[in-house]
Amino acid sequence: MNFLNEAQAYEGEMRAFFEDLHRHPEPSHFENRTNRRVREQLKAHGIDMLCPKDNITIAVIHGAKPGKTVGLRFDTDALQLQELCDVPYKSEHDGLMHGCGHDAHTTCGVYVARLLKTHADELCGTYKIIFQPAEEGEHGADEVIATGLVSDVDAFFGLHVWSLYPTGTLHATPGGIWAEPDMFKITIHGKGGHGATPE
């Protein structure tokens, strides 16, 4: 298995899918179009899925050999911000944009599912690719857990794009990172941006 080479072969398709999601951002709890697009891709490639709600999709890939169940979580919601960038795939929805990379995360999830499906006969265990709504402080993980469809997951993994690192690199740390221990409110005046890096 050479996942990197295979993933690079999907680059054109991935870019088109990403740009479509970027043009059509959806707020927390209303990621219905995003999930329809995800489901179209999964169905086209024969990937089993669980669809407990219009805004939650869980792709399921069973490996040929027994093993544990792994959850791979990808968030889908956008931010309530006006996009100021002038790119060909700019948000078509006033006051909404993918400013935190969830369009990229969702794209990664779709193509991870495709790669795992392609190699299912070589894999152990079960893989659940979870397209989570409402990650932006809106209890989307609770919504997924409440479905009961991830109670069998032995280990969860997630990812986040970060512009501080070069494209094509992976950075990991043992244990949790950037876990939210508490909520607080502050007021920042500026042009706009993500709460982690306000302008």
What are these regions (language model features)?
Residues 1-98, 107-110, 114-123:
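Acidic/His- and Gly-rich active-site-bordering loop/insert found
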Residues 79-81, 87-97, 104, 121-199:
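Histidine/acidic-residue-rich, glycine-tolerant segments that coordinate divalent metal ions
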